[in-house]
Amino acid sequence: MTVRLPRKSPAGRGCSSISPAPSASRSVSTSEHGTARRSDVIQPRGRAGTCAALALAASVCGATARAQLPPDPAGTIEPLPPASPHWVWVNDVAFFAFPDGRAFLVDGDSGKMLGMLSTGYSFTGVVAPKARGLIYSPESYFSRGTRGTRTDVVTIYDATRLVPVGEIEIPPKRASVMPMPGAQALTDDDRFLLIYNYTPAQSLTVVDTRSRKFVGEIEIAGCALVYPTGPRTFFSICGDGALLVTTLTDEGKVARSARTAAFIDVLNDPLTEKGVRRGDTWLFASFEGVLHPLRSTPTGVEADPTWPLFTPQELTQHWRTGGLQHLAVHGGRGRLFAIVHQGGPETHKDLGEQIWVYDLVSHRRVQTIAMRNKVGSIQVSQDPRPLLFACSLENNRLDIYDATSGKYLRSVDPLGLTPTVLVTP
């Protein structure tokens, strides 16, 4: 079938109008010498021929229009606006896609996701220094995706553009554990990044953030995790109920390491490892709901008097703390936030539907905040008008509340796959 195409428009762009094809059975053409001759090619007849001509012409016009479009820009990265105290990092271990850990940056005021980091296998969480210019992320990768040679690194991200700007290779020993706040931490001056290892021998990797080099490994046999107490000091919790207090030199080597007395009754009422810090004091809750303040001193760590989170009547009603990150603190207001639920012994990982708020001076509950969804992780911003962030492994969403009134504000839903630890910059 032969179809006459429309002429090009005078300007050379776009498409001209299309007239119906003639219904003659034969067409007449002119030879190169100008002699008219009859063509043996059959022309399309009637409405069918017209439709075919229109379709072909339209396709040609579409191709012409596409060719005239300017190319889309690629590789453009928009910098973030100035950081807000209401931003929060939502770490996602991605249980259903384990090699593909992620960290999402969310603006609590707008409920919008500002950016995302791809953070590798068995991801435990990012670390945000006080200076806010960079983000540190301990990560693991395998040469064949889910197998092959393992490489552990600390990836350094620009906190404004969320792009990698450096990488420090570390020994492939980083603990592949359920994400928890104590798995990695910076010393108080942001100089050294400490990363918990479990092979099953327990140790800490030390990274100098100034020189961007691996410094060495510190043995913490029988103890776990890392809780900073100063520019060069931190402690780990030991299996016998004691603490291992370590002091570093300016080169990141061990200057002093000593065990305290056993502060914790590990047989009758052990602590969870999910502590929160206010000033020089770390606060830990026991399985039975007793709060243990551990205060750093120039010579080590001392245990201040404990106090109960639950009254005897509440204990008979089986109220317990529980969750993956079940405590949060607002330092300025002196408030402790705790996820609670009703359950029996060994339910310290269960999700909760309420947040109980305590005054850290009077040791009394002053507020109860009902959650819209069961939650396992909470975090509170540290500004004068704080937000309360809440999420859980079971619901890939982030709920946001006014931390003062307890009023629900908004949700980011969905968000990731299995959100875990929350970090405020």
Where are these regions (language model features)?
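A short beta-strand motif characteristic of beta-propeller blades
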Residues: 69-71, 112-118, 163-175, 213-218, ...
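Short, conserved, GDST-rich strand-edge loop motifs in beta-rich repeat architectures
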Residues: 82, 88-95, 138-151, 338-352
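Short coil/turn segments that connect the beta-strands within blades of beta-propeller domains
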Residues: 84-86, 131-133, 189-191, 231-232, ...
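Short glycine/acidic-enriched loop and turn motifs that connect beta-strands
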Residues: 94-97, 141-145, 200-201, 241-243, ...
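Short loop/turn segments that connect beta-strands within beta-propeller blades
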Residues: 108-110, 159-161, 208-212, 248-251, ...
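Asp-box/WD-like beta-propeller blade repeats and closely related beta-sheet repeat scaffolds
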Residues: 161-203, 213-225
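Loop/turn-rich, solvent-exposed surfaces of beta-rich toroidal or solenoidal domains
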Residues: 319-360, 368-383
